[in-house]
From Swiss-Prot:
This is Sister chromatid cohesion protein PDS5 homolog B-B. Residues 1197-1215, 1234-1244, 1265-1274, 1455-1464 have a biased composition (Basic and acidic residues). Belongs to the PDS5 family. Plays a role in androgen-induced proliferative arrest. Required for maintenance of sister chromatid cohesion during mitosis. Pfam families: PDS5. Phosphorylated in mitotic cells.
Length: 1464
């Protein structure tokens, strides 16, 4: 190479060939040109050119002069920087610059030039890139390690590179920057805090969002230098976290964000930092804990995080924060739980336990977010959440807060739609969440209108999406309905019913609006608006909005027309969509984004629009059912057995025929139904009949060919079909045909003539058919019906036992195990009731006779003839039938008037029957009549006796029914304010007098001052009063108190002269008064209204008499705890300790219940076995669980399961102390005097409970009994099986001799629950007995006295020593106990023919048409004979001979002759 003259060692600068001197004397352009040549020269040189290195040394020093480093032109500076970079490369490892200051200036200069990398579009960018590449490759900056100010140089370099990096740079730029910076970290001795900050600052979220490339650069750098930089990162966090030296860095406040980012980049960077977080989690500073929890939530939930498995102590410590005292911390834990569930399924088990607790958190937001987290994970993949987690969401659908309930319901709905309605989800997933559809529909039982509306919306959008095509929509509905459980089906049916009712209300409103304006019309419109408002959320605002909407309807004819079309029965789904859209568009205001008025109207339109059902939909649904019938449907693929699909489809059509009857009016639909009617399947035919009944009113006119084909089928079903088919056939004929009388005659005549007790199956159908004809056409067959009832139904069916029943200890068996003869008798009873309900009058006194017959069945425990042929389950069925029949007749005013108080009281006692199913079904009948406002108010008082039910679920369900009935009446009175004349029969508070009267005559209430019996009275009263007093509306507490005070001024109208009965009544009043005083603070206020007591139950108050006496024993007053009634939970309490709920105090009585149950040999669920009380803690627990839905049929499931297994197990294992035992004369049977004796005899005729008896004893007996109970308490833990029952029981006392009754204290007549009649010795003859002679009365009194002292008996362990002296007056009287009483042996075991005295059932005949019982019945002669024998024994005292006085024989003969008239 030719060189310019220069000498390196004499300080002269040698330039490359062709390059002249570079100085400030040349222009910028020339300088740039010459520098480019210099750059080219240095670029081509390598480290091995020692000669050239020496030659250009001075040039290298010259280029580092301040002239170049501070040159104003950027091109000059860039070229100089490139030269310097090459010089460092060429002279490496030693630089030609020895001055530290110069080196610092040079590197600071090069760093400044690197800023040119920012503009990737610059023409000089390649030269900047060359500069970066050169210094990165050579690691030129490593020279600075020797400098004192190296930290400043490195920090500036890092900041420069992080600031210039952008998305215009390619991977090479990124790589060189990482190489350059990593060499400084990896090869340096230390990393200063400033340098570390320059890297970490790019990880802070704010910076990260501003420059993503800088974040990526920092991330790459940290990954590259992880091992080298980790100690400095650890030191930084130690200083900040542990020592609190936040001043060491500006990033101290972002420490938790940095930990998260560093963990995501490389977890090894924090190996020593993470243990410090465990310490921070336990900090006393709430905010600090919150920050750590936020951090760890993200770290544990990150997708690829292994932190939980790598650091288990930290994970466990973090889980502990789910229970932190600070609400935001718990909230944060719950919020991020979904990430852990979604990204780490293995952590679900740990999280489940903590989410369970948080799902009951007192804080609403936390419970809400638990649901959100679980639902979010479930929507991603159902496998991520276990059944337990889904159950937490399920529980929260009953939360007390609407926001939480809504989130839970919507979450379940979304999960259901995703996995049940989408085929790709798979059958397994659909199976796992199959319960959701049932649960969501169950919520429709809630009282809250918001819940109900949301269920409707969920059903329309998620369960059966309304936007599907008609065929798909109906298929979805068809198979949904087929797989719903019973209660969900009821809820869905109720939903359609409510929507249909609201549709009719809106239609009525439109009709009222169209009428000319009048004052009455305005009131009617207002009333209708109020009714509709109750079907909308927020009734307060809803009322105002609906008034406004009513005004719009009056003014805008177009909107009114659209609404009329919408509520029209012929409106199709597509028309409904158009109408809703047009109305909302017209009412909407674009300038008002949130319009509460429009939202409310949308709610209304959603509820009334037929979004699912129209004529096309019904046709499509019937085609689906037909496909299933033909076997061409894909039922099995849908997971539904074909038979189940067909029945469900027809059931669905049946329900829709109620709510959308017009949609069925097509020939195709009716022809399909006719085909179903001819099928062999009974259920299918039944459903088809019901659909015809509901929709067929136009068939005769519009579809004559259907009418012609239908008539013979209906006649055939009425004569030969199943009982239900026969019933619906008659109703179809009544609904469809105008010439129904002719059709009825063609059916009635042959059936009437061919009634055959020998063919019970056909006889049942005939009785059903005739019964319904009698009800629908009572005047058409008056004479033959009356004759048939008298001669056939009563005489041949009810009073005749053909075959002996199966011997069993069970009290109930399934329907298919009930004997045909019993089923016939039940239908006979129903037929008589239907006949009476059809007549609706008692002119022929048939009602009186029937009521006497029904009460006789109850008296005789269901075995009317008392031949002993009937099995116990059959007797239970007949008791239920008789009780239900009386309740049915009581709903008709003309028959309610003739039901005597004794008959009413006897009917009431069926609610305490020993058979669980009898109690359950009778309660349902009672509730049905009460909720429809058909039964008089006194029948609501029967609910008070449910407090004695031993089954907790039965008590809870009875309470629900009572709550609903009280609310129904209050709601009715609010809506019909003008019905003041009905106030006495509707105001719920008026149930109190009836309850007091009923409890006064309760056969369990024997001794006026008995503490245990009064406790039971208290429980029964509180059962009713608790609900009545839950709200003090219109000063009702004072009104109830005043009512009770009024009763104490009256006498018992049933037995006005019976001092003991009146004293009982006043004692019950005192119990009620104590309850009122202890549970209310406003009882002492003056009631604005004066109560009116029912004259049938109470005499007129004696204004001259002030009854201020206190009748309660002092010991009982301690049982009335002061304070207000405990408020009941409506929805699930949050974080409530459930373990203590439902526990009863372990009192003496509760222990006695347990022992009593253990030692008795019968059904543990019957009142005769145990009698628990429903205390307040039980109530809370019940309401927390499933009893929040007032009208819900869900309650009682547990007891249903026990019906045939648990409840009956003890019956099979242990002999139950039955009503009839071998000591009773087998010939002893039902006699005719039962049906003819006067039914209302003051004092002597008191209400009884069929199968249960009670009697009183002397004071000495009571004391002895108390002493015996104390001894038994001491022994009860030693031998439960052998210890006697200690719980009071409804039953008769042990048999003792006549002389055991003290002369000073005459025996007390007590109400008894049995078939035996007791006439007190001191009772004077009544007017109805004037025709009897005095001696005859005395004889009858002697008989009754004897009966009281004797009666049937059977030895039991607890009575083993009862055969002592007949004169032992200290013999204890066992306390009452529900169920059949234990039998005790008579005092003298002589040959005793024990008669069966009975309670009087009816009044004296008022007409010649009286009940007739065949003289051929063995019950008559045998029973009379037994009574005569018993009477003779009693008269002659201990003599074993039998004598019959002439007067006695004459009296019996007279009684026989009086019963020989016609029955009806």
């Amino acid at each position: 190479m030719a060189l310019s003259k220069a000498k390196g060692n004499d300080g002269k600068i040698t330039y490359p060939p062709g390059v002249k001197e570079i100085s400030d004397k040349i222009s910028k352009e020339e300088m740039v040109r010459r520098l480019k040549m210099v750059v080219k020269t240095f670029m081509d040189m390598d480290q091995d050119s020692e000669e050239e290195k020496e030659q250009y040394l001075n040039l290298a020093l010259h280029l580092a002069s301040d002239f170049f480093l501070k040159h104003p032109d950027k091109d000059v500076r860039l070229l100089v920087a490139c030269c310097l970079a090459d010089i460092f490369r060429i002279y490496a490892p030693e630089a030609p610059y020895t001055s530290p200051d110069k080196l610092k200036d040079i590197f600071m200069f090069i760093t400044r030039q690197l800023k040119g990398l920012e503009d990737t579009k610059s023409p000089q960018f390649n030269r900047y890139f060359y500069l970066l590449e050169n210094i990165a490759w050579v690691k030129s900056y490593n020279i600075c390690f020797e400098l004192e100010d190296c930290n400043e140089i490195f920090t500036q370099l890092y900041r420069t590179l992080f600031s210039v990096i952008n998305n215009g740079h390619n991977q090479k730029v990124h790589m060189h920057m990482v190489d350059l910076m990593s060499s400084i970290v990896c090869e340096g001795d230390t990393v200063s805090q400033e340098l570390l900050d320059s890297v970490l600052v790019n990880l802070v979220p704010a910076h990260k969002n501003l420059n993503k490339q800088a974040y990526d650069l920092a991330k790459a750098l940290l990954k590259r230098t992880a091992q080298a930089i980790e100690p400095y990162i650890t030191n930084f966090f130690n200083q900040v976290l542990m020592l609190g030296k936040t001043s060491i860095s500006d990033l101290s406040e972002h420490v938790f964000d940095l930990i998260l980012e560093l963990y995501n980049i490389d977890s090894h960077l924090l190996l020593s930092v993470l243990p410090q977080l465990e310490f921070k989690l336990k900090s006393n500073d709430n905010e600090e804990r919150l920050q750590v929890v936020k951090l760890l939530a993200k770290m544990f939930g990150a997708k690829d995080s292994e932190l939980a498995s790598q650091n288990k102590p930290l994970w466990q410590c973090y889980l502990g924060r789910f229970n932190d005292i600070h609400v935001p911390i718990r909230l944060e834990c719950v919020k991020f739980a979904s990430h852990s569930l979604m990204n780490h399924p293995d952590l679900a088990k740990d999280l489940t336990e903590y989410l369970k607790v948080r799902s009951h958190d007192p804080e609403e937001a936390i419970r809400h977010d638990v649901i959100v987290s679980i639902v979010t994970a479930a929507k991603k993949d159902l496998l991520l959440v276990n059944d337990q987690l889904l159950n937490f969401v399920r529980e929260r659908t009953l939360d007390k807060r609407w926001r939480v309930r809504k989130e839970a319901m919507m979450g379940l709905a979304q999960i259901y739609k995703k996995y049940s309605l989408q085929v790709e989800a798979g059958k397994e997933s659909a199976k796992q969440i199959s319960w959701i559809k049932d649960k969501l529909l169950h919520i429709y039982y809630q009282n809250s209108i918001d819940d109900r509306l949301l269920v409707e919306r969920i059903f329309a959008q998620y369960m059966v999406p309304h936007n599907l095509e008609t065929t798909e929509r109906m298929k979805c509905l068809y198979y949904l309905y087929a797989t719903l459980d019973t209660n969900a089906v009821k809820a869905l049916n109720e939903m359609w019913k409510c929507q249909n009712m609201l549709r009719h209300h809106v239609k009525d409103l439109l009709d009222l609006i169209k009428k000319p304006k009048t004052e009455a019309g305005s009131k009617a419109i207002f009333s209708k608006v109020m009714v509709i408002t109750k079907n909308l959320p927020d009734p307060g605002k809803g009322q105002d909005f609906l008034k406004k909407f009513t005004q719009v309807l009056e003014d805008d004819e177009k909107i009114r027309g659209q609404l009329e079309k919408l509520v029209s029965p012929t409106c199709s789904y597509k028309q409904a969509e158009v109408c809703v859209r047009d109305i909302t568009k017209k009412l909407g205001n674009p300038k008002q984004p949130t319009n509460p008025f429009l939202e409310m109207i949308k709610f209304l339109l959603e509820r009334i629009a037929p979004v699912h059902i129209d004529t096309e939909s019904i046709s499509s649904l019937i085609k689906l059912v037909n496909k299933s019938i033909d076997g061409t449907a894909d039922d099995e693929d849908e997971g539904v057995p074909t038979d189940q699909a067909i029945r469900a489809g027809l059931e669905l059509l049946k329900v829709l025929s109620f709510t959308h009857p017009i949609s069925f009016h097509s020939a195709e639909t009716f022809e399909s139904l006719l085909a179903c009617l001819k099928m062999d399947d009974e259920k299918v035919a039944e459903a088809a009949l019901q659909i015809f009944k509901n929709t067929g009113n136009k068939i005769e006119e519009d579809f004559p060919h259907i009418r012609s084909a239908l008539l013979p089928v209906l006649q055939q079903k009425a004569k030969k079909g199943s009982p239900r088919q026969a019933k619906y056939s008659i109703h179809c004929i009544h609904a469809i045909f105008s010439s129904k009388e002719t059709q009825f005659a063609q059916i009635f005549e042959p059936l009437h003539k061919s009634l055959d007790p020998g063919n019970p199956e056909q006889l049942i159908t005939s009785l059903v058919t005739i019964g319904h004809i009698a009800q629908l056409a009572p005047d058409q067959f008056t004479a033959p019906l009356k004759s048939m009832v008298a001669t056939f139904v009563v005489k041949d069916l009810l009073m005749s036992d053909q075959l002996p029943g199966k011997k069993t200890t069970k009290l109930w068996v399934p329907d298919d195990e009930v004997s045909q003869e019993t089923m016939v008798k039940i239908q006979a009873i129903k037929m008589m009731v239907r006949w009476l309900l059809g007549m609706k009058n008692n002119l022929s006194k048939s009602g009186n006779s029937t009521l006497r017959l029904l009460t006789a069945i109850l008296h005789t425990d269901g075995d009317l003839t008392e031949h002993g042929k009937l099995s116990k389950p059959d007797m239970s069925r007949l008791r239920l039938a008789a009780g239900s029949a009386i309740v049915k007749l009581a709903q008709e005013p003309c028959y309610h008037e003739i039901i005597t108080l004794e008959q009413y009281q006897l009917c009431a006692l069926v609610i305490n029957d020993e058979c669980y199913q009898v109690r359950q079904l009778f309660a349902q009948k009672l509730h049905k009549g009460l909720s429809r406002l058909r039964l008089p108010l006194e029948y609501m008082a029967i609910c008070a006796l449910c407090a004695k039910d031993p089954v907790k679920e039965r008590r809870a369900h009875a309470r629900q029914c009572l709550v609903k009935n009280i609310n129904v009446r209050r709601e009715y009175l609010k809506q019909h304010a003008a019905v003041s004349e009905k106030l006495f029969s509707l105001l719920p508070e008026y149930v109190v007098p009836y309850t007091v009267h009923l409890l006064t005559h309760d056969p369990d209430y024997v001794k006026v001052q008995d503490i245990e019996q009064l406790k039971d009275i208290k429980e029964c009263l509180w059962f009713v009063l608790e609900i009545l007093m839950s709200k003090n509306e219109n000063n009702s507490h004072a009104f109830i108190r005043k009512m009770v005070e009024y009763i104490k001024q009256t006498k018992d109208a049933q037995n006005p002269d019976d001092q003991k009965m009146n004293e009982k009544m006043y004692t019950v009043c005192d119990v009620a008064m104590n309850i009122i005083i202890s549970k209310s603070t406003t009882y002492s206020l003056e009631s604005p209204k004066d109560p009116v007591l029912p004259a049938r139950f109470f005499t007129q108050p004696d204004k001259n008499f002030s009854n201020t006496k206190h009748y309660l024993p002092a010991e009982l007053k301690s049982f009335f705890t002061p304070g207000k009634p405990k408020s009941t939970n409506v929805l699930g309490a949050v974080n409530k300790p459930l373990s203590s709920a439902g526990k009863q105090m372990q009192s003496k009585s509760s222990r006695m219940e347990t022992v009593s149950n253990a030692s008795s040999g019968s059904n543990p669920s019957s009142p005769g076995r145990i009698k628990g009380r429903l205390d307040s803690t039980e109530l809370d627990q019940i309401e927390y669980e499933d009893y929040t839905m007032i009208s819900s049929p869900l309650s009682g499931k547990k007891s249903d399961k026990r019906d045939d297994s648990d409840l009956l197990k003890s019956e099979v294992e242990k002999p139950r102390r039955g009503r009839k035992q071998p000591l009773i004369d087998p010939d002893d049977s039902f006699s005719m005097d039962e049906l003819s004796k006067p039914a209302q005899e003051p004092k002597s005729r008191t209400s009884q409970r069929g199968r249960k008896r009670a009697a009183a004893a002397s004071e000495s007996e009571e004391q002895a009994w108390q002493e015996k109970r104390l001894k038994e308490d001491l022994l009860e833990n030693e031998d439960e099986q052998n210890s006697p029952p200690k719980k009071g029981r409804r039953g008769r006392p042990p048999k003792s001799a006549k002389m055991a009754i003290s002369k000073e204290e005459p025996p007390v007549t007590t109400p008894k629950r049995g078939r035996k009649n007791v006439v007190p010795i001191e009772s004077p003859p009544t007017d109805e007995e004037d025709h009897l002679e005095i001696s005859e009365e005395q004889d009858s009194e002697n008989i009754d006295q004897k009966r009281k002292g004797r009666g049937s008996s059977k030895k039991t362990p607890q009575k083993s020593d009862s055969t002592d002296s007949a004169l032992d007056t200290s013999r204890p009287t066992p306390q009452k106990r529900r169920g059949r009483p234990p039998k005790t042996p008579t005092v003298q075991q002589k040959k005793s023919h024990v008669g069966r005295p009975r309670k009087v059932v009816s009044k004296e005949p008022e007409s010649e048409e009286e009940m007739e019982i065949s003289q051929n019945s063995p019950a008559l002669s045998e029973n009379i004979s037994n009574e005569e024998e018993t009477a003779d024994e009693e008269v002659v005292a201990p003599s074993t001979g039998r004598r019959r006085t002439a007067k006695k024989r004459r009296w019996i003969q007279r009684m026989k002759s009086e019963l020989e008239g016609p029955l009806l």
